[in-house]
Amino acid sequence: MNDVKKDPVELVLCDMDGTLLLPDHTLSPRTFEAVKSLQDAGIHFTLASGRPPKAMREIIKQLDIQLPFAGFNGGLLVNAQGEYLQSHHVHPEAVRKTLDLLAGHKVEVWLFVEDDWLLRDPHGEMVEHEQQGLGYAPQVVESFEPYLHQVHKIVATCNDAPLLMSLEQRLQPLLKGLAVASRSQARYLDITALEANKGNALVTLAEYLDVPLARTVAIGDGGNDPAMFRRAGFSVAMGQAPEEVRAQAQVVTGSNIEDGVAQAIDRFIL
């Protein structure tokens, strides 16, 4: 193990998109083998993502992960049998405030209610890309009104990254004490429950597995990942992560197209 990391590692919590996965949402052979090496060494490995659990299950299956995993940035904690261990909905007032603000901007707005992906415009330019990533189709609804009390995540998305950054900065004070707004990727602004962040997910998973936080590692690339960086014993940012994300990790590995997760496992964990 590299001398940067002092405590033996018992649990690795890893982001998916932009971290574990290649840009085409697949696992590289090198990363697959590195995760298997971790598991063979008796080190727990599981995932935390902004995705709904349904969109995580194929990778969970490929890696034979038998541990609970966190969807919606920790909004849903799910065990290997698909049972919910924790479920956090976005406060209805936060949902309404968010929808009201976003209505005045050229962004696509999606709601996630458990595994259902709800939208009003099936022809939005981001829909096809999202469907490829999630692996299933959206449900078209006339109105979001019936779902205000059931929301696990709101997504605002478009190709205008500066607009999403501006909306994030406006939503954070607006939703203070009600919900969390963070960009999981440059083109995705997520609004999740106040309790739903990857840091809380890491703490819950560590307690579930009886692992001290000092013996945990968090790996990620997005604006929703520093929450787990701050709680983990050791934190790793991907090479292509935004500068403000890299600055909050203890070390930086290669990018996801360079098998950065495998590099981190080989260099800092095994």
Predicted regions and their residues:
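Mg2+-dependent phosphoryl-transfer enzymes with acidic/Ser/Thr/Gly-rich catalytic loops
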Residues: N2-L11, S28, D190-L270
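Hydrophobic packing residues within well-ordered alpha-helices of enzyme cores
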Residues: T31, M56-I60, L167, L171, ...
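Residue-level signal for inorganic ion chemistry
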Residues: L38, S49, N73, I154, ...
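Short active-site oxyanion
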Residues: G42-T46, I65-L67, K153, A214-R215, ...
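Conserved acidic, metal-coordinating active-site core of Asp-based
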Residues: H105-I219, G223, A227-R231, Q240
